[in-house]
Amino acid sequence: MREFQYPVGATPLDPDEAAGLLLTHITTRSELDRWEQGNIIEALAWLDQTKPSDILNEQFIRALHRRMFGRVWKWAGDFRQSDKNIGGPWHQVPMSVKNLCDDARLWINLREEEPDQVAVRFHHRLVSIHPFANGNGRHARLMTDVFLEAVLKRPKFTWGSADLSKPGDARHRYIAALHEADQNNYVPLNKFVRT
């Protein structure tokens, strides 16, 4: 596999992860993007058919990633085995995901925050954990939308009404809002997800 250029804010693959590309005919980033998008469309169809409700667990989080990227990457659905430019040490990922799911249940039961705020916190935390080798932003956005619809009974977020996997103003604002959330300021992310 060739070296691909990554958009600003994307997590580069290490050589072992890059070797997990199942489609060896892919030579450009645009080809990779097309194949991944096709796989994500299949995952969306699977979600529409299955209407999952038991989603706050490691098994579902991993299954969703596998459905989104499993036709393209060998490691799809497997937690990362290397440290990245974001997220804690790779060996802490399973416990971090479990803690996130437990915390999300607690946030729901406490009813101290509006459902959108709970979903924003969930999304930010999942992105911060960065559980997979790649595809974390797309996975976290889709996982948050499933959380909104299946658990919180709210409509999906609009995510700036743009394709956030592509460079541009919306992606820049999204990443800036995530950085603000890192500092415990969720206002920009709350605004962004419903624009």
Where are these regions (language model features)?
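FIC/Doc superfamily catalytic core
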Residues: 1-195
